[in-house]
C-alpha cells in the first residue's frame, strides 16, 4: 500500500477482498465461501489441511493470503523482459530519443529522476525503478476521487502518518511510497491518488 500499512506481501494480499471500493466482500466468511466454489482449490486445501479446516474461516483466509503472496513472488511477475532490459543485454537498441531519455533519467544533478526511482546505482539490470522509500511531494488533492468516495471537502489523506506503525510522527504526514516506473506508460492515472491523467503532467509537476 502507498502508506506502507501492510507489513508483508501476505498481509497486503488480504486487503483488497474486504475493501468496499475494491472487491467489496462482506467478510472473511464470504470470501471463504467463494473460494470453496472452486472445486480444484477446495480439494487442494482439503488434501493438505484436512476437512476440518473448512470450519475455520480465519485459517482459510490466511491460506489464501499466503498462496497469493507466494504466487506474486514468482519470476512471472518480474520477468525483466522489456526493451530496456533487452537493450542492457545487448538484444535490442534504443532509438535516439530513447537514449536521450535514459541519459536524462539517470542524471544525478539535473533531472534527478533516479534519486528516487532507482534501487541499485551500481548495476542497472533487474532494476525495479523505486527505492521503496516514502516522500511528501505536495501532490494536489484529487477532488473527483474525494467526491466519489463521499469523504467531504475537508478530508486529507495523511499517508504514512495514518500508518499505525508510525505512531503519530507528524514528520511523516503526506508521505507516500515511491512507485515503480515499470510499465508506467500504461498505468495511468498517476500519483498515489490518481490526480494526474497524463504522464507529461507528472513531469511538469515535478
What role is predicted for each listed range?
Residues 20, 29-99, 103, 107-108, ...:
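Post-cleavage N-terminal segment of exported redox proteins
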Residues 8, 27, 55-56, 198:
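Intrinsic-disorder/low-complexity, polar/charged segments
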Residues 20, 24, 79, 112-113, ...:
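Secondary-structure transition/capping residues
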Residues 23-25, 64, 165, 191:
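Detector for methionine-enriched segments
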Residues 1-14, 83-205:
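Short glycine/threonine-rich turn/loop motifs
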Residues 2-37:
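Glycine/proline-centered hinge or cleavage motifs at structural transition points of membrane proteins
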Amino acid at each position: 500500500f502507498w502508506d506502507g500499512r501492510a507489513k508483508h506481501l501476505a498481509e497486503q494480499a488480504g486487503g483488497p477482498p474486504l475493501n468496499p471500493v475494491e472487491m467489496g466482500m462482506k467478510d472473511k466468511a464470504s470470501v471463504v465461501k467463494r473460494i470453496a466454489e472452486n472445486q480444484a482449490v477446495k480439494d487442494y486445501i482439503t488434501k493438505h489441511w484436512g476437512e476440518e479446516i473448512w470450519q475455520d474461516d480465519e485459517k482459510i483466509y490466511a491460506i489464501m493470503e499466503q498462496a497469493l503472496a507466494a504466487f506474486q513472488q514468482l519470476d512471472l511477475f518480474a520477468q525483466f523482459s522489456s526493451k530496456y532490459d533487452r537493450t542492457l543485454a545487448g538484444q535490442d537498441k534504443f532509438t535516439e530519443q530513447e537514449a536521450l531519455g535514459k541519459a536524462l533519467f539517470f542524471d544525478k544533478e539535473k533531472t534527478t529522476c533516479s534519486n528516487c526511482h532507482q534501487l541499485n546505482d551500481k548495476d542497472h539490470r533487474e532494476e525495479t525503478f523505486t527505492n521503496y522509500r516514502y516522500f511528501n511531494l505536495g501532490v494536489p488533492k484529487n477532488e473527483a476521487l474525494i467526491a466519489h468516495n463521499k469523504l467531504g471537502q475537508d478530508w486529507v489523506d495523511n499517508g504514512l502518518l495514518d500508518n499505525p506503525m508510525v505512531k503519530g510522527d507528524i514528520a511523516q504526514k503526506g508521505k507516500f511510497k515511491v512507485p515503480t516506473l515499470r510499465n508506467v506508460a500504461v498505468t495511468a492515472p498517476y500519483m498515489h491518488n490518481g490526480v494526474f491523467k497524463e504522464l507529461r503532467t507528472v513531469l511538469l509537476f515535478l
